[in-house]
Amino acid sequence: SAHPGVHRLVADLKSRGFNHAKVHEGLYDNFLENRLRFIGHVLLHRMEIFYEYNTALIAVPKSDLLRFDIKTGDTEGLVNFPQTIQGIKLVAVVIDRDEERKWSFRSKGDFDCNAFARKYFEGGGHFAAAGGRSSDPLDVAVKKFIQAIKENKSQLQ
């Protein structure tokens, strides 16, 4: 948060010897090797870019989760990588989890992830970040996503 009170609180903590680098390291610089290899694999082999819709999709099959011994929390943050691609307004990640597919959506600009997730994927969240689910098989869920972005092309331009 960029609220002034947060900055005052952080300044107070720093003046008392708070070691922010140690906290950052514990939270973010603590991957296991398999997680980093998984991220590289899915970015190389599972990410699709739909430039005509300014959209990126990462569809992760169950076989990848098993191959890299990925647990539920290990996919956290995956949705943020494609947001760094110039021109991308919508990012979707779908993870094939047992009986259902879990969706994560992130947007930049004026595309409403919350409305999109509610309308197409039994989900919701916030304007720029939302989640959803699908009971369809992964390939069918991906086809429905592609149809959904086609229906929203004007909002994704």
Where in this protein do the model-derived segments appear?
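Hydrophobic helix-and-loop "lid/oligomerization" segment in the mid-to-C-terminal part
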Residues: S1-Y120, G125-Q157
